[in-house]
UniProtKB/Swiss-Prot annotation:
<dbReference type="GO" id="GO:0006412">
    <property type="term" value="P:translation"/>
</dbReference>
<comment type="similarity">
    <text>Belongs to the universal ribosomal protein uS2 family.</text>
</comment>
<keyword id="KW-0963">Cytoplasm</keyword>
<dbReference type="GO" id="GO:0000028">
    <property type="term" value="P:ribosomal small subunit assembly"/>
</dbReference>
<dbReference type="InterPro" id="IPR005707">
    <property type="entry name" value="Ribosomal_uS2_euk/arc"/>
</dbReference>
<dbReference type="Pfam" id="PF00318">
    <property type="entry name" value="Ribosomal_S2"/>
</dbReference>
<dbReference type="InterPro" id="IPR001865">
    <property type="entry name" value="Ribosomal_uS2"/>
</dbReference>
<dbReference type="GO" id="GO:0022627">
    <property type="term" value="C:cytosolic small ribosomal subunit"/>
</dbReference>
<protein>
    <recommendedName>
        <fullName>Small ribosomal subunit protein uS2y</fullName>
    </recommendedName>
</protein>
<dbReference type="InterPro" id="IPR027498">
    <property type="entry name" value="Ribosomal_uS2_euk"/>
</dbReference>
<feature type="modified residue" description="N-acetylalanine">
    <location>
        <position position="2"/>
    </location>
</feature>
<dbReference type="InterPro" id="IPR018130">
    <property type="entry name" value="Ribosomal_uS2_CS"/>
</dbReference>
<dbReference type="InterPro" id="IPR023591">
    <property type="entry name" value="Ribosomal_uS2_flav_dom_sf"/>
</dbReference>
<keyword id="KW-0007">Acetylation</keyword>
<dbReference type="GO" id="GO:0003735">
    <property type="term" value="F:structural constituent of ribosome"/>
</dbReference>
<comment type="subunit">
    <text>Component of the small ribosomal subunit. Mature ribosomes consist of a small (40S) and a large (60S) subunit. The 40S subunit contains about 33 different proteins and 1 molecule of RNA (18S). The 60S subunit contains about 49 different proteins and 3 molecules of RNA (25S, 5.8S and 5S). Interacts with ribosomal protein S21.</text>
</comment>
<keyword id="KW-0689">Ribosomal protein</keyword>
Length: 280
């Protein structure tokens, strides 16, 4: 039993270290030049250029806490993940796709959580936001409706009405995508959808923001490939595409149909005699 416990602890440590290395490569640790007094506990140090460095060990712990809260809600449709920042819209849609929660990508419609006369009115049990500054409207409405809020908070983010603040860089496209990918994987592991020791087959690149020009360029390239391997049109078809060997063979004669029972063919089908009975 003790050996199994040590092995499990070693696996968890290695997984945490791998996640921290991924967050380092995605610049999750880079804060801003300003620091809110409520975010000082999550700051590791300050660089010479004035940028605050976030302690990624505490970021990973807060991701685990947020995943436990998400798993504790029975119906995933009672959770709304939202991002008004363009860099986080693709990430929230992918997070909603793999975890089953509802996503709102784009501008928040005022009154979504407070005005019952609206068609888009909703009463979620949990709210997940990308940035407390850009998503200030849903935070205020969630506070009026007593909705718990989870948010990715930078060093200068306001912490008012935020129940679980995950310290991280919430302004970079790679950082936001990496955070939502890690949170989605932790949620699926706690639900038992994927094994803890099993590597998730979904790439983190799918959660990254893509420029519209880049997506359009890839779409044009796919269209060109389909045009190259498409069928030849009627105006482009020529006999040169058929080899000479295909023309030299003899044409097979069609199989003649068997004569109908009771019908006598004399000289041809025109002169066939009409049967005496059986047509009725």
């Amino acid at each position: 039993m003790a050996a199994n416990g040590v092995a499990t602890a070693g696996r968890q440590v290695s997984e945490k270290e791998a996640d921290i290395q991924m967050m380092l490569s995605a610049d999750v640790h880079l804060g801003t030049k300003n620091c809110n007094y409520q975010m000082e506990r999550y700051v590791f140090k300050r660089r010479d250029d004035g940028i605050y460095i976030i302690n990624l060990g505490k970021t990973w712990d807060k991701l685990q806490m947020a995943a436990r809260v998400i798993v504790a809600i029975e119906n995933p449709k009672d959770i709304i993940v939202q991002s008004a920042r363009p860099y986080g819209q693709r990430a929230v849609l992918k997070f909603a796709q793999y975890t089953g929660v509802n996503a709102i990508a784009g501008r928040h419609t005022p009154g979504t959580f407070t005005n019952q006369m609206q068609t888009s009115f909703s009463e979620p049990r949990l709210l997940i936001l990308t940035d407390p500054r850009t998503d200030h409207q849903p935070i205020k409405e969630g506070a009026l409706g007593n909705i718990p809020t989870i948010a990715f908070c930078d060093t200068d983010s306001p912490m008012g009405f935020v129940d679980i603040g995950i310290p991280a860089n919430n302004k970079g496209k790679h950082s936001i995508g990496c955070l939502f990918w890690l949170l989605a994987r932790m949620v699926l592991q706690m639900r038992g959808t994927i094994l803890a020791a099993q590597k998730w087959d979904v790439m983190v690149d799918l959660f990254f923001y893509r420029e519209p020009e880049e997506a359009k360029q890839e779409g044009d390239e796919e269209a060109e490939v389909q045009a190259d391997y498409g069928m030849v049109g009627g105006d482009q078809w020529t006999t040169a595409q058929i080899s000479d060997a295909a023309w030299s063979g003899e044409v097979e004669q069609p199989i003649s149909a068997a004569p109908a029972v009771g019908v006598t063919v004399a000289a041809g089908w025109e002169a066939a005699s009409v049967p005496a009975a059986g047509w009725e």
